[in-house]
Amino acid sequence: SAALVWCGPAPGEAGRAEPLHRFPDAPARGRLLFLLFSTGLLGIGYEVLGIRVMSQVTENTVYSFASALTVYLLGTAAGAAVFQRTGARAGFEAPLAALLALLAVACGLGLAVLGAARGIYETARAALGGGFAGSVGAEMILALAVFGLPTLLMGALFSLLTQAMRQRDGGVGQALAVNTLGAALAPLLFGVVLMWAAGSKVALLIVAAGYVALLPRFRPLAHGAVLAVLLAVTVLVPDLRLLHLHPNFKLVTAREGVRATVAVVDDNSDHGSGAASLNKPPPRLLVVNNRFHMGGTGPGEFLQSRQAHLPLLLHAAPRRALFLGLGTGITFAAAGAHPDLIGDGVELLPEVVAVIDQFQPATAALYSSDRLRVHVADARRFVQAAGEPYDVIVADLFHPYHDGAGALYTVEHFDAIRRLLAPDGLFCQWLPLYQLDEDVLKIIIRSFLKVFPEARGWWCYFNAQTPVLGLIGEARPRRYPADWYERRVTAPQLADSAASFGLGSTLLVLGTFAAAPRDLQAFAGPGPLNTNDHPVVAFRAPRHVYRKDRPGHANLLALMASADPDPAGLLEPGGIDLAPRLGAYVRARDTFFRARILIDSGMQREGEDMLVDSAGVSADFPTGYETVLYLAEGYRRANRARAVELLKALNSARPERGEARSMLEQLQQQR
């Protein structure tokens, strides 16, 4: 299109009146074209870099980027309009020099504003009352602080240059074409090459220096003043890696990349000075753009490893597996315990891949086994381009409100995955229920069922505060024999690994069953689907992160209210003997969930009593029993009577276990 514009005037342009203001001191056409190209390059370069740095502070939703773009475009338009009314009579060279010098200063000041971006955003958000409107308003205020003055000057400069190009043979069209060409190259030069090679601060200083270099002639006073401002900014703003870490976090390493700033931190929150903590390193976490915690070692290994083991164990004999999204790499590394499995792991951010070694020994398999291959790629494109089918595909916990992540929950993406599965393959999409509004969760489940109508739901682990649901879709629902685990798990390494993460028997694997297809269909109900042409998740999911007023267990409770899972339907006819135990296990698990929800809701006593009920339902589900023991230990000094009451009830519910009775006897001896 730029070439077509270059060939001549736009329709009707040659017939328009002469411009109101001619510039007798306008430079030659070649220099004008160079200025138009350069200012387009620098202007969009500043925008790309500004948005990239702000992404470390804002919520990174579609509204965050819309706010920045709105301010940028409105500022440019306003600057052009104001200049047409007030500055067009002042000739060409003097306004050009002034605008270029002011733009260099404005970009330098913008760099300083970016250094204070967190304070600006948090102050504005608090002043506006938070919530959805307040948060989006704060993002717009931050964008105004970063882009306001520079874009006004950019608009005025573009107006000046196009006015100088205005001729009867179509100069404005050529001006726009050349300026757009420079703008088109800016994301590659500044957002990729310079961002990767020098970092955001140096890249922004290069933008400011670029405007200085375009000044018509050397003026010692003007050049000196501009360079003094840029030097001051360079010294006063030490870094634009706006790391904002919890006081108990200790930075291990950080990388500033094209798309994100990635940090690895040690979490010393619960790491005291006792002997146990001296011998055990603190949990190590992966943090992206300050907001996204992508898992880590310590307690997080349990969840992340189960994300790999559970879907793989539900397949009879997986030979090829694909993992979409790596994070710390712990989930993908857990797949290395499955013998003869060849795995491909796909991660969008190269900076994340570069720090996976920081999570050893949990990720050691990625370095010791040639069966696990890591790819830096976009998950959607990798799925579309992959050739050989996979037996198991596992999609990680994508943050649904993050700009671009909504596309990973579309019908089209799910359908592309279905076509990539082997005939007996299965696909597991993990969902962070605590990061979703109920209506968004229903849209995702509805979209998944559109492609996998026989999908089932599975709990990754039994945490009511941060529940994680796996949607597992396959061509036809499987049924499992009572000795499934014994048949499936024969390698000692796999048996040890699965058992260490609570998946050491058929009962424990199938006991994660959460919802049958009919349960998911009843919960999701009728409504819109998330598609490429109707990306409702991208626009609705951010409401949750902006409001932050919904408890993590809300979706867990809503799904449990709609579902009545019958785990007996998972078993082959010959496995009927396991059905009563499996049913009791699921009932005890759900009772435990409800007990934890009561406690989290402030109903401590009622929740504790329900934990005792959970212990009494199934001897195979020990979590309720062990939780009550832990609570009773905490009550020993603060509320001895309550401790005795809980221990008596627990011993009555499960008398064959001796821990409650032993603790009760100790308390009675201490009278």
Where do the PLM segments sit?
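Short coil turns that delineate tetratricopeptide repeat
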Residues: 619-622, 655
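Alpha-helical transmembrane segments of multi-pass membrane proteins
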Residues: 1-478, 484-487, 541, 546-548
